[in-house]
């Protein structure tokens, strides 16, 4: 069984790093936005490295899914840097980084009572698969405190009352704060309960309900990561206790910034194990980005400006994405040919537009 799973992962790796045309088209939009995200948040990364690093992110995501279903990996988890709190009830806050899908397994192995918070409703199949996996872990490690893993959606009626009930019963609340809006991790720009914070020298809007819950119910937050280094290691950071001497708004603002500062430090060490590069453009201040001035690079021969733009395909339609502003536009066949190096079919108006917008330089 173990060998079969390893073979499956190797197959996935091969498809990611040596994609066929169908795979390229499938990942086309994700690739484009990831390249733009690298340029915005990691400007020191060479443009020529964007595609390889995008594939590294996708492979890290694939490994996380593989790790979750490979129960044997739990046997060798390294807990030497994990310090759980003495309190029965607290919030374990993590990120979509590295081996994050192993955190629930860790709590089962450590015989802890916990529940998971997501944003959207979970499909029946996902619940069934998760429960089968839970039963395997429970039996393997003789967990005596859980019969199932309650999963709460923030969109459920009475969500906050369910959280209060479970915390009072002595459960740990497990939540992934970066992109906590469902299984795809996508957040809406300037949605409800969003805070503006600094992240890699850019302003982003993030969900801020987690610190408010800690403040209301007077429970600490324990930041935790699961990362790959000679195996899988679970590491905790200093706990954050609600400061009731300040307002809930001030505590929320300070805490959410602190949590993303922690995430940034983690990412700097190994940037491409964070899934957020696939969707962080959803959090950007687009109004601010739209005011960026276009590059004025000149060249004697017209070529596609791959530093500023990247093209992608969705449902057989061609688009171009501005990496600086994160705005995308549908383009016609002639423009796509020009991007590919064939400019003979362009009209004068199309050619002028491409030069004016620095798409061709």
Language model regions located:
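Membrane-anchoring hydrophobic helices of lipid-metabolizing enzymes
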Residues: 1-105, 113, 131-140
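Short internal beta-strands
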Residues: 115-122
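Short, charged, surface-exposed secondary-structure boundary motifs
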Residues: 124-130, 233
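Short, basic, glycine/proline-bearing loop/turn elements
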Residues: 141-151, 192-199
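Active-site glycine- and acidic-residue-rich loops that bind
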Residues: 148-160
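Non-catalytic C-terminal accessory region of glycerolipid acyltransferases
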Residues: 157-318, 348-356
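Low-complexity, glycine/alanine/valine/leucine- and proline-rich hydrophobic stretches
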Residues: 309-338
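Long, charge-rich, low-complexity alpha-helical segments
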Residues: 329-361
